[in-house]
Regions:
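Helix-loop-helix hairpin linking two adjacent transmembrane segments in secondary transporters
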Residues: 109, 146-193
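Helix-to-loop junctions at the C-terminal end of transmembrane segments
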Residues: 71-82, 270-283, 373
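Cytoplasmic helix-loop-helix junction between adjacent transmembrane helices
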Residues: 113-151
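C-terminal transmembrane helical hairpin of 12-TM major facilitator-type secondary transporters
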Residues: 285-334
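Intracellular juxtamembrane helix-capping segments at the cytosolic ends
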Residues: 123-135, 328-343
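Conserved MFS/SLC helix-loop-helix module at the cytosolic interface between two early adjacent transmembrane helices
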Residues: 69-107
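Juxtamembrane intracellular "pre-TM" segments in multi-pass secondary transporters
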Residues: 6-14, 193-226
Length: 410
């Protein structure tokens, strides 16, 4: 019989085994990767179902919308119920939704399945607090950082994997392989995960209501959610339309779009250093540096657009992909540091609010970018990304408002 996890504030935790850290990082990466498999496959899906770029662009939009909904409705339940049960149920549901996507005969069913994929992929955000709960406070930052590296790597390598598999075996093979892998890792977690004692005694209704109170009384949380949402709108706009641009301008397949995921993976691999930098120089300063790096990267992409049909454009684009992704990830980790310090007794709910802002931004970015690309092309998408990045920087430069602290929301 597995033992329950005790309150880490009151009890010294044994060291979490290295294999379990690796498994949790792998799970977080695989779950969140499910959101992005479709992006390098859009041209293949469009050809298969005979759809234009604007219509097929609704696929990542619905997936991100499902994720945002799941963040708001399901992530807070990790404070109320045993996280082991929550993770395992979501793992089975995600594997089922991925398999259903693979066998769907038409776009309508693919869209429904993708929406469910988005909802259940939120298990990635259940894994992170689970890792924290199993770790003593003196080691928690290191362990959570390792799991976050797995999550961020999953986001970017998902495009590489789906791009190559889609190019050689078709888009349905991507989802079949993902479903099988998700089922396998869920079985392994069933064997390895301990039980967790729920952290909150609030009812489900009170738990949800407390999130509104948390957001209303913490100005820093509001600012973090909006600023990161703007940055991720730029992030999503770029990745949603990249495969379409490469196909139309360079006649390159999904594997080429996937290769850009390797360039972006550099940002994920540097994530642990951003947390240390936020501790050393302050998270506020790091959000400003990250937003500036993101905005400048997109501005340079805009200027480079005049050379879009030359051999120099793709290498320049690859370098700027690395830099803008580093900026977005730098801001995300720094914003997490800010909200955890702002609401230390409600980290799961604060994290849910921040990430809901992130993926509302990503949903909006996908939708806007699909329409911009369809009507005005790639340069319009990059102009949009530059604009929203500049707005995020402006927001981070504004002076901080005094936060109204309220412990009654806990």
């Amino acid at each position: 019989m597995m033992k329950s996890m005790h309150d880490t504030h009151n009890t010294q935790q044994p060291a979490i085994p290295g294999y379990l850290i690796f498994m949790l990082a792998l799970t977080a990466g695989m779950a969140v990767a499910s959101l992005y498999y479709c992006q390098p496959l859009l041209a293949l899906l469009g050809n298969d179902f005979h759809l234009n770029s604007a219509t097929v662009g609704t696929l990542p939009t619905l997936t991100q919308a499902g994720y945002a909904l799941g963040l708001m409705l399901l992530i807070p339940l990790g404070d109320k119920f045993d996280r082991r049960h929550v993770i395992l149920v979501k793992g089975l549901a995600l594997a089922t939704a991925l398999a259903f996507t693979a066998v769907s005969p038409g776009l309508a069913l693919v869209l429904v399945a993708s929406f469910i994929v988005g909802i259940t992929a939120t298990m990635a955000q259940d894994v992170i607090p689970a890792a924290a709960a199993m770790t003593d406070s003196s080691q928690r930052g290191r362990v959570v950082g390792q799991v976050m590296t797995g999550l961020l790597t999953g986001i970017l390598l998902s495009r590489v994997i789906s791009g190559f598999i889609g190019e050689w075996f078709g888009w349905r093979s991507v989802y079949l392989a993902a479903a099988a892998a998700m089922l396998l890792v869920t079985i392994l977690l069933w064997r390895a995960l301990p039980r967790f004692t729920p952290a909150s005694t609030l009812s489900v209704g009170e738990l949800y209501r407390s999130m509104f109170s948390l957001l209303a009384t913490h100005a820093k949380l509001q600012k973090a959610a909006v600023a990161q949402g703007l940055l991720n709108a730029a992030f999503s706009a770029f990745w949603t339309t990249l495969a379409l641009m490469l196909y139309q301008n360079f006649h390159l397949g999904s594997s080429a779009a996937g290769l850009f995921g390797l360039a972006g993976a550099v940002g994920a691999l540097t994530a642990p250093f951003f947390g240390k930098a936020a501790d050393r120089f302050g998270p506020q300063r790091m959000t400003r540096i990250g937003a500036l790096l993101t905005g400048v990267s997109f501005l340079l992409m805009l200027f480079a657009g005049s050379a879009i049909n030359t051999t120099w454009y793709l290498p320049i684009l690859a370098v700027l992909t690395v830099s803008f992704d580093m900026g977005v990830q730098m801001c995300l980790i720094s914003h997490q540091t800010i909200i955890y310090n702002t609401a230390p007794h409600a980290m799961s709910r604060a994290n849910a609010i921040l990430l809901a802002g992130v993926f509302i931004g990503m949903t909006s970015g996908s939708l806007v970018a699909s329409q911009l690309f369809s009507h005005w092309g790639w340069q319009a998408v990059i102009a949009f990304a530059t604009l929203v990045s500049a707005l995020a920087l402006l927001l981070r430069l504004l002076p901080e408002r005094r936060t109204m602290i309220s412990d009654t929301v806990i």
